[in-house]
Structure formats: structure tokens, C-alpha cells
Amino acid sequence: MSTESQPVNPLSNYFRQPAIHIKLPSGGKYYPENALDLPVTGEIPVFPMTVKDELTLKTPDSLMNGSGIVEVINSCCPNILDPWQIPNIDLEAIFIAIKIASYGAGLDLSTECPHCSHKQEQTIDLNLLLAKIPDEEYGNPLKVKTLTFNFRPPNYYNVNDAAKISFQQNKL
């Protein structure tokens, strides 16, 4: 009886690897079923962007309709199975992590004083910024007389839809 093994790809050592793992501010709450594959560690892996991802983020139409953001999240955060369902509170952390994974933790900024033209160079440590994002909790219902209001953060689909409507109204 012979045992057949899968052929090993000689380039497998060069495949993209996760560069960082992050804990989502929502803790994985507020995702519908089958929208997130949260590992037992509670942290999702984040891969660096590919050239295709960078080009996607430079395409105005894909940014306007939200599909570009979804494609980049699909590529860089494969544990997020449906990026349209991401609670808004997780988006900032995800994109900071993608930036760290792709370009490193330092974000160089250059500013110029409008009054004296003095130039200021500064580097922001994105790891510190990522660590300062608070964990959000929406579990406390609000009771008003006989009514009870339960809150949840909007998901990316809702936020993107509202932004498109706002853009259309401002265009008029």
C-alpha cells in the first residue's frame, strides 16, 4: 500500500505571511454568523498589501462604492469572511494594522506652519495608536418608560451606504 503525498510547492516558503495579529476593538461581537472566523486567541492575522491591493485603493470608483475597501480587507484579513459586516468600530484598527503590516509601524508626517513657514517633521508610532483604540461595548440597553433600546455599532455596509447617499445629496 503506497501513500501518496501532495507535491510541495518550492515557492511555498515565499508565500505571504501574516505580519501582525490584532485584537478587534469589538472583540468579535456584533458580527453576524459566518462573517468572522475568530481564532481561539481572539486575534486575527493581518497580511501585508499586495501591489493589486495598493492599486485598488487608488481606484476612485472602487473606493466610492466600497468594493475597493472590501477587496483589500479580503486580501489582508482572510479571517474576516464578509467585510461588509464589519462593525464600524473595528475598521480603524483593521486599517492601521494593514498599514503596519505593509509599511512598518512608523508614519512620517510633515507639516508647515501657515504663519511662519516653519517645517516640522514627526514620526507617529502606529503600534501605540493601535494600542490606544478602546474596546467598545454596546451591551447596556437604554430604558425609557416602557421602551427598551438596544444598541449596536453600524456595519461597514450601512456606513458606506450612508456616505454614498450623503455624497449624492452634496453633489446636487
Positions of the model-derived regions?
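Long C-terminal interaction/binding lobes of large macromolecular proteins
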Residues: 1-172
